Amino acid sequence: MKNWTRLAAAMFVCCIAAVSCSKGGEDPFLKIESQTTFSVAAENASGEIKISSNVAWTISGATKWCTPEVTSGSGSRTVALTITDNDTRNPRSATLTVASSQGKYAINVSQEGNMNLNFYEEGSYKAVEINRQSNAVNIVIMGDGFILDDLTDGGAYDQALDRAREAFFDIEPFRSYRDHFNVYYVYAESKQRGATYGYGYDGSTRQNFASAVRNTAFSAAFTQEANSTATSCDYQKVFNYARRVPVMKQGADIVLDSDGNPVSGAITDPDNIINKTVIILVINDQRYAGTCIMYGSGACIGMCPMSTSPGTMSFEATLRHEVGGHGFGRFADEYIYYDEALPSSGGSYNATNLAAWQGIGQYLNVSLANVTDQAPSNWQPFLADPETYPEVGFFEGACTYAKGIWRAEQNSIMNDNVRYFNGPQAYFIYRKIKTLSNETPSWEEFVANDAARIREQANANSATVQNALGAGEKFIPLAPPILIGMPQ
């Protein structure tokens, strides 16, 4: 009887198992029916993963260029892979992982390098914005620290220069008078991305600075201590690359000495077009830094890394300060470092040098006296009309010093990079644009078109600027400009 009972129980278990198997299918499993290693073409490629399973599974390891249509599921399914075109000459690979409770499989995808790409030739140029056939203000933009793969049509080089161009015009009065400008790009290949840290382009070293050398076209370098924003490059090479643009070819190639002083060539002729042109060097580095080198003849190079800092320390804000403010506007800084009077000599700013530069029409955003009839000429119409422009007056402190030097408004782009040129700054820029375009400026025209700039004034509030930086961040003023060719 006992044996019969045991036999019946065993038969019952077998029946249950059989029923279970017939209702639930086979044991849990996961298989990949397609290839687990495959290669695709550089363009117009696709792929798939054929999953055979009766359990839940996931797919991980997606990249920007190789993405599965789903990242999880259950049961059998063919998962399509989206594979973007390879826009470099270099092959690339990705590994996707299909995993479940029953194990995992690696799917290895490789893509060929693209041999069909067209790269800009070294030293070539492109006219990207032609608003005038004659009497235009010229802007030449080039990049440093961009390798050959970046130099495709619409590639990283073009995208960076596009950002620079739009940033320059994204402020009044440049926005309103954009149709007075022509813009050109010049292409240069670097062997490495980035910029040099801790060395000047001439190979000189700096102290207390983490050093890293990059082989770049224009030898852009961050040249001072770790907390400095000072920047340099091979100025002579930049000037002569700008001359690759046909309209810039007046005169002979430029020769500078080791300190950047003019020796010969176009830059020594005050009437040469190089001295009426804005040159922007976009540096392919994320550091917050930037410097403008300004020549007494009018030439300039604004050096701007592609800062990833927020707010008024961004790439765009830095470029507007360095290029629009220093380079085109020829303005002095308005921030304050020292709680003392502007010295008569020595340092980056002093009264003697300021007076000399103002004598040739530069640094007219600051005043050495707080007396109306001694203020720069571009201040005069504002001071004469306090009802229309009540914000303009004498505010002590500029050029890194708290006393003995005055700015025209409480705040402006030359203080903390805020997107706002104050009244006298904007009027100077307007007059320069009109003059370089062989047109006659007038106070009446400026006022008639000034409403858009006035609306930007609300952005000049320092509290608003600070809030835009984010919690715990403090605005860092940019290094003073480099002055070459001091007036005698």
Where are these regions (language model features)?
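Sec-dependent bacterial lipoprotein signal peptides
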Residues: 1-20
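Bacterial Sec-dependent N-terminal signal peptides
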Residues: 15-37, 101-103, 108-117
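N-terminal low-structure segments adjacent to metalloprotease catalytic domains
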Residues: 22-25, 113-212, 423-488
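Extracellular/luminal low-complexity segments enriched in Ser/Thr/Pro
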Residues: 70, 78-93
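A short beta-strand micro-motif common to beta-rich folds, especially ectodomain repeats
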Residues: 90-102
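Active-site-proximal segment of zinc-dependent metalloprotease catalytic domains
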Residues: 120-135, 142-146, 166-338
